[in-house]
Amino acid sequence: MRTVWTICLILFIVIIGFFGDLIWYGVQQGIGQAKIIYRAEEVSDVLSNANTPDSVKLKLNFIQQVRAYAQDSLGLNDSKNYTSFFDQEGKDLMWVVQACPEFSLEAYTWNYGFLGRLPYRGYFDSLRSAKLSKQLWDEGYDVDVSPVQAWSTLGWFRDPILSNMLDEDEGMLARLVIHELT
């Protein structure tokens, strides 16, 4: 039995050694997403709240119409995404870092294990995104750090409507919602 525990400990140390940064990044992302998902309110509750401005109610109803269109006319699955609402109180929630070599359009990519390589890295902490941006800049990359309006948990969780999404006109809002539902 002692041999089994020793092998497990060695495997654990090796996995942390090779994938520790990726695991820590995943934990940070999970915490950021969980805070938002946990604090989100049901759209039906927001719509029935007398204190909700009419402009917010109109956009929330529009998003529900876009969801129905995406399911009925485009054949997308009913994922229950965008059936809850998170008020950002005017603050950005997430920042995406993108980079490429100077004078190049070839994107720098990050390895996300079983998800593959992606040309961006997102953070729920602006200081972490700024730190990575500076590191890449110091390595000679052109870097862009941008706040994002929405993101997808790829069906793992029920993604909420973020209040800053409501700043978009109907055309852009429909595009954003359909994009995130696919």
Spans of model-derived segments:
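Acidic/His-rich structured neighborhood in mature extracellular/periplasmic domains
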Residues: Q65-T182
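N-terminal low-structure segments adjacent to metalloprotease catalytic domains
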Residues: M1-K91
